[in-house]
């Protein structure tokens, strides 16, 4: 079987993505902490060039639960800190491990890692966070099913409020085209994805752009947000707080969303900035389900990439 990577949402077909999501649902039904032998005898590397809580823990726990050996490397804990070329690291890891999950700020470095002869998963890069967005889609469909609606995300209205130039927003833009839902990108001027990415999505009728938070949330089935200053933008924090003044997802914003709407945030949250406590902890929030679902979706994705089927 030719090796497959998961570097962006569109690295699967729609049918393949739904297959991964169905597998994740089956894995979630297993008792918490149950270990299997599906990947017994294998090792999966998790290489972290950026600080991480949820990504590291969800991959490390998930790999162990599948019966494989997690090998976690940070930049400072490896020869990467001394300038070893990423392609050399990739070639060596591929001799030891069966797959690599890579969290980096550089898409160029991600593509170099993907030269490895084993599957490579984008665990975050500067222009995408596909494992998070795929997990979020799982969370949305799970919430819909819990309310008795099993029609899925297709045709839904998903709003992303905040920094629409972020890796999260850009993966949502790709996801809208693959999963056939309507994405509303709502953010201040100057904080939008590259024009060519927006134009591609607009041609398929899958995106609306607005610079008004309440207009962005209007009629939305899902209201999604993220931090205003991501890792790497700390020096711009004060500038961004000023630019995003009035963009907090709160009761006033949510009053414009559909009555059945849910709220997502990939965490960590800066409470009182992009989202307030009342909304984050309120009945519409699916944030904690969303965090858990990273574990199940990533396990399913690893099984799929390695060609392992559930019995």
UniProtKB/Swiss-Prot annotation:
Gene3D superfamilies: Aspartate/ornithine carbamoyltransferase
One Pfam family hit: OTCace
Enzyme class: transferase
Domain of life from the UniProt record: Bacteria
Residue ranges that the Swiss-Prot or TrEMBL entry lists as coiled coil: none
Keyword set includes Protein transport: no
Keywords from the named record: Amino-acid biosynthesis, Arginine biosynthesis, Cytoplasm, Transferase
Amino acids binding carbamoyl phosphate: 52-55, 79, 103, 129-132, 266-267, 294
Keyword Hydrolase: no
Binding residues for L-ornithine: 167, 226, 230-231
Localization (cell): Cytoplasm
Broad class of where this protein is predominantly found: cytoplasm
InterPro entries per record: Asp/Orn_carbamoyltranf_P-bd (IPR006132), Asp/Orn_carbamoylTrfase (IPR006130), Asp/Orn_carbamoylTrfase_sf (IPR036901), Asp_carbamoyltransf_Asp/Orn-bd (IPR006131), Orn/put_carbamltrans (IPR002292), OTCase_ArgI (IPR024904)
EC numbers, comma separated: 2.1.3.3
A Gene Ontology cellular-component term: cytoplasm
Pathway the protein acts in: Amino-acid biosynthesis; L-arginine biosynthesis; L-arginine from L-ornithine and carbamoyl phosphate: step 1/3
Catalytic activity line of the entry: carbamoyl phosphate + L-ornithine = L-citrulline + phosphate + H(+)
GO molecular function ontology, one term from the record: ornithine carbamoyltransferase activity
A Gene Ontology BP annotation from the UniProt entry: citrulline biosynthetic process
Family: Belongs to the aspartate/ornithine carbamoyltransferase superfamily. OTCase family.
General function of this protein: Reversibly catalyzes the transfer of the carbamoyl group from carbamoyl phosphate (CP) to the N(epsilon) atom of ornithine (ORN) to produce L-citrulline.
NCBIfam families, alphabetized: orni_carb_tr (TIGR00658), PRK00779.1 (NF001986)
Protein name: Ornithine carbamoyltransferase
UniProt organism field: Sorangium cellulosum (strain So ce56)
Chain's gene name: argF
């Amino acid at each position: 079987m030719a090796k497959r990577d998961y570097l962006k949402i569109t690295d699967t077909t729609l049918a393949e993505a739904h297959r991964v999501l169905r597998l994740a649902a089956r894995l979630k039904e297993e008792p918490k902490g149950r270990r299997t032998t599906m990947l017994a005898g294998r090792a999966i590397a998790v290489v972290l060039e950026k600080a991480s809580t949820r990504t590291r823990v969800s991959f490390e726990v998930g790999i162990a639960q599948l019966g494989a050996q997690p090998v976690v490397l940070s930049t400072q804990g490896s020869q990467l800190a001394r300038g070893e070329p990423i392609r050399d690291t990739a070639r060596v890891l591929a001799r030891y491990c069966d797959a690599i999950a890579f969290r980096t700020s550089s898409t160029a470095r991600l593509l170099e890692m993907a030269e490895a002869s084993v599957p490579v998963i984008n665990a975050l890069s500067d222009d995408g966070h596909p494992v998070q967005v795929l997990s979020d889609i799982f969370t949305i469909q799970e919430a819909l099913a819990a309310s008795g609606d099993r029609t899925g995300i297709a045709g839904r209205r998903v709003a992303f409020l905040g920094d629409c130039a972020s890796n999260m927003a850009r993966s949502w833009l790709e996801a809208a085209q693959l999963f056939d839902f309507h994405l509303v990108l709502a953010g201040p001027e100057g904080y939008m994805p590259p024009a060519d990415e927006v134009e591609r999505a607009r041609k398929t009728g899958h995106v609306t752009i607005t610079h008004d938070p309440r207009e962005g949330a209007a009629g939305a089935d899902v209201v999604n947000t993220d931090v205003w200053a991501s890792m790497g933008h700390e020096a711009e924090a004060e500038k961004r707080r000023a630019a995003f003044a009035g963009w907090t997802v709160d009761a006033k914003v949510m009053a414009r969303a559909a009555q059945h709407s849910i709220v997502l945030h990939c965490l960590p949250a800066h409470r009182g900035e992009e989202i307030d406590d009342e909304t984050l902890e309120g009945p519409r929030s699916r944030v904690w389900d969303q965090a858990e679902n990273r574990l199940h979706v990533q396990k399913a994705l690893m099984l799929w990439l390695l060609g392992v089927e559930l019995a």
